């Protein structure tokens, strides 16, 4: 085992070798190189060692090249530059001269120089290994001690220089410096440690808080509830809910409002049909189908609302309903009116009656050439503004009228009297709203009062002798009135709609004077009495079958006037407001069936003539 107990003697020998530029390396210096290969400690400065390493390198390469196979036998590799002994030797020597201190690979260099053939048999590989260890930049200072194992091998040595030793040195230096600082000023050292410990802790605590705040702004507010007071959480939740409500209500305020009201109205219609207990299976099925669509749409509209479970949302939706009640009517499609008229026609029982109804609709659809229907349309458009207020009262009166249809004949006069009383209680407000109607209808007052007196007497005469024919036609009248009632309950808002919808309904079902005369000529007295009993203000929904009664047609003009009688009696009570009272008397008729509007038109047209 090589020891450096005689380091002074080796230093003298090294200086003599460097000064004399000797070519042969003495034995003591060979032992020194073995020591460096074992420990990695150069002991001496690099300036005194440079010549020794240079001469040792040249001698080893020379002997290795002489003993190795010829250079011509060395194969050429595509990924490696061709080997040239002279150029590589000169480059290694130049690079070795550039070091100002011992390279950190000095231990590996010494190993290669001591025993060159231990790991390499070809000169090219050996010289490339030397090149790897010389083409470095890092250097080390002398005086470093290395640990040795029991068998003499260095534990810190590596194949291509000791890189781990460099790291260990840095750690030891830091530890030594820290120990020195602590020894010199223990109080200051402890304070510095406390500051170092406190700073990263504060940073670590601040960063998670910032991240937590970002996450909670996105949507997880419950985790923050323990830190904040209840009032702050409540205000924040309300603000976010208001923003969500604004976004949701701008998208579907009209849909929710339009869907919910028909659902409630259809529910009321089902309750009223249960009280009447009349068999109308086709109309009930259609009512259920129409009920299913808005109810399902209503559920779809309310599902996100329920999932959020927000009370403020419901309040805002209720306020939106109140604000947009006036706008709902204009938004509803006009096609529903035509569909419901077709539903009423499809519910008629007999095939002949349906055919006659189709003919009557064709006749009614032809507008009059003289333009006489324009005035009734204007009067209706002005009167429809107040129909919204009185719609619930009139639906209750219609229920009373339907319940009295199955009673005896004398009960037919009661609905007419109730309607006359209701129309008498309302004329003043309507006359104020409709000054134009008063100016238009001021001329034919005398003829209207005369027709009204005749119509009351004819109505009483027609109702008494026809009690027997009433029992036969209960089924037809009950079905027709029930279908009309469903149409009223499904679209009360539609009948009391804006003037644009009103004009569409009036244009689809106007009745010319000729059509009114034809329908009057086809009705026998008994059937007309029955229809007047069923609905005094409404003419027969369908022209009756002639086979039921074969009585002579003597009183058809008087019975035609009987259809006009409700409006005429109202005009008799209030002379100055005849047009408005007549229109209000026919409001229920307009809701019951499209034919009601037609009768109002024909009554006013006959009076004008």
UniProtKB/Swiss-Prot annotation:
Keywords: Phosphoprotein. The modification Phosphothreonine is found at residue 602. GO terms for cellular component: chromosome, centromeric region; cytoplasm; nucleus; protein phosphatase 4 complex. Residues 258-270, 401-410 have a biased composition (Acidic residues). Residues 175-569 are annotated as: Disordered. Residues 183-194 have a biased composition (Low complexity). Residues 201-225, 233-244, 310-351, 375-400, 414-462 have a biased composition (Basic and acidic residues). GO terms for molecular function: protein phosphatase regulator activity. GO terms for biological process: mitotic cell cycle; negative regulation of peptidoglycan recognition protein signaling pathway; negative regulation of smoothened signaling pathway. The modification Phosphoserine is found at residues 68, 223, 226, 252, 603. Regulatory subunit of serine/threonine-protein phosphatase 4 (PP4). The probable PP4 complex Pp4-19C-PPP4R2r-flfl (PPP4C-PPP4R2-PPP4R3) is required to prevent caspase induced cell death (in vitro). Serine/threonine-protein phosphatase 4 (PP4) occurs in different assemblies of the catalytic and one or more regulatory subunits. Probably part of a PP4 PPP4C-PPP4R2-PPP4R3 complex containing Pp4-19C, PPP4R2r and flfl. This is Serine/threonine-protein phosphatase 4 regulatory subunit 2. The gene is PPP4R2r.
């Amino acid at each position: 085992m090589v020891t450096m107990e005689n380091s002074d003697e080796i230093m003298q020998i090294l200086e003599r070798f460097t000064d004399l530029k000797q070519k042969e390396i003495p034995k003591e210096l060979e032992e020194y190189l073995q020591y460096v290969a074992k420990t990695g400690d150069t002991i001496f400065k690099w300036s005194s060692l440079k010549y020794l390493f240079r001469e040792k390198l040249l001698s080893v390469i020379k002997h290795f090249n002489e003993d190795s196979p010829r250079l011509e036998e060395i194969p050429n590799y595509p990924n490696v530059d061709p080997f040239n002994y002279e150029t590589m030797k000169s480059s290694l020597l130049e690079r070795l001269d550039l070091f100002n201190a011992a390279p950190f690979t000095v231990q590996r260099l010494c190993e290669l120089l001591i025993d060159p053939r231990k790991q390499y048999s070809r000169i090219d590989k050996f010289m490339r290994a030397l090149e790897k260890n010389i083409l470095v930049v890092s250097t080390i200072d002398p005086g470093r001690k290395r640990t040795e194992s029991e068998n003499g091998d260095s534990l810190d040595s590596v194949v291509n220089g000791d890189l781990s030793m460099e790291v260990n040195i840095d750690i030891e230096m830091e530890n030594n410096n820290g120990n020195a600082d602590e020894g010199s000023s223990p109080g200051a050292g402890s304070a510095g440690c406390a500051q170092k410990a406190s700073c990263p802790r504060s940073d670590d605590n601040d960063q998670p808080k910032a991240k937590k705040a970002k996450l909670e702004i996105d949507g997880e507010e419950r985790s923050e509830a323990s830190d904040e007071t209840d009032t702050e959480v409540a205000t924040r939740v309300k603000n976010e809910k208001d923003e969500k409500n604004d976004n949701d209500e701008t998208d579907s305020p009209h849909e929710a409002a339009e869907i919910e009201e028909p659902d409630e109205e259809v529910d009321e219609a089902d309750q009223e049909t249960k009280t009447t207990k009349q068999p109308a299976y086709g109309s009930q099925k259609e009512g259920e189908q129409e009920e299913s669509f808005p109810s399902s749409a209503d559920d779809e509209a309310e599902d996100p609302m329920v999932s959020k479970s927000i009370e403020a949302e419901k309040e805002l939706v209720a306020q939106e309903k109140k604000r947009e009640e006036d706008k709902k009517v204009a938004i509803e499609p006009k096609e529903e009116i035509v569909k419901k008229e077709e539903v009423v026609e499809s519910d008629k029982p007999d095939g002949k009656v349906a055919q006659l109804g189709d003919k009557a609709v064709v006749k009614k659809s032809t507008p009059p050439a003289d333009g006489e229907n324009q005035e009734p349309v204007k009067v209706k458009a002005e009167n429809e503004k107040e129909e919204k207020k009185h719609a619930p009262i009139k639906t209750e009166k219609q229920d009373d009228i339907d319940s009295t249809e199955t009673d005896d004949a004398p009960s037919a006069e009661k609905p007419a009297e109730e309607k006359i009383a209701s129309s008498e209680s309302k004329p003043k407000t309507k006359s104020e709203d409709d000054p134009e109607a008063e100016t238009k209808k001021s001329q034919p007052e005398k003829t209207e009062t005369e027709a009204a007196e005749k119509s009351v007497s004819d109505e009483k005469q027609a109702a008494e002798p026809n009690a027997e024919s009433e029992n036969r036609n209960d089924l037809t009248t009950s079905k027709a009135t029930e279908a009309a009632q469903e149409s009223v309950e499904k679209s009360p808002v539609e009948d009391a709609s804006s003037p644009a919808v009103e004009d569409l309904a009036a244009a689809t079902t106007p009745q010319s004077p000729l059509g009114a005369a034809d329908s009057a000529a086809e009705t026998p007295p008994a059937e007309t009495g029955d229809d007047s009993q069923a609905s005094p203000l409404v003419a027969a929904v369908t022209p009756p079958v002639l086979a039921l009664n074969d009585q002579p047609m003597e009183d058809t003009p008087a019975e035609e006037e009987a259809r006009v009688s409700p409006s005429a009696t109202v005009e008799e009570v209030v002379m100055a407001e005849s047009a408005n009272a007549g229109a209000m008397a026919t409001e229920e008729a307009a809701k019951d069936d499209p034919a009601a509007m037609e009768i109002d038109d024909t009554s006013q047209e006959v009076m004008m003539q």
